[in-house]
Amino acid sequence: MKTITITSIPGFDEWREASRECIAKRIPPEHIILQSAHSVQEDLFGSGDEQCESKRPRSNLSIPKSTVMLLKYALCHNDENRFALCYRVLWRVVYENRQLIQMKTDDDVIQLFAMAKAVKRDAYKMSAFLRFREISLEGQEHFVAWYEPEHFSLELKLDFFQTRFKNMRWSIL
């Protein structure tokens, strides 16, 4: 059993790298424990984290861009099982049914779309309703806003704020 701990938030890049290596080694989802760093529990027998370090060159997976984007949004959800669900769906797309995402009655696909929808809604609310207040900090203008997202959606909207407010000093707390 492989245990992989994702330490970054939301963890897409780290998850993608670990998933590529595990898919290349054909490790089925039921033989992997994917968890976030803040949900790590001590193993009863103390076996530490293992990485899927592949001895052979990484295979070039060809996954539809729409599937990758769906996984990226779902990985921003706050559900602790998001990494395992996304790996299970990726495994099924690669080894079982390349058109899995079009199967709207599949339980994993339903859950994946629901998670992505919740994250998109959260990200939309941030860009639509977030309001900055001007403060003076060391004699300079600074704009501060407070937002508490339900999911890890802040990274998805950083580009929006950087381009919209590129000439301002701002912070989102």
Language-model region placement:
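Extended, well-folded catalytic/binding cores that form a central cleft or groove in large enzyme
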Residues: M1-L173
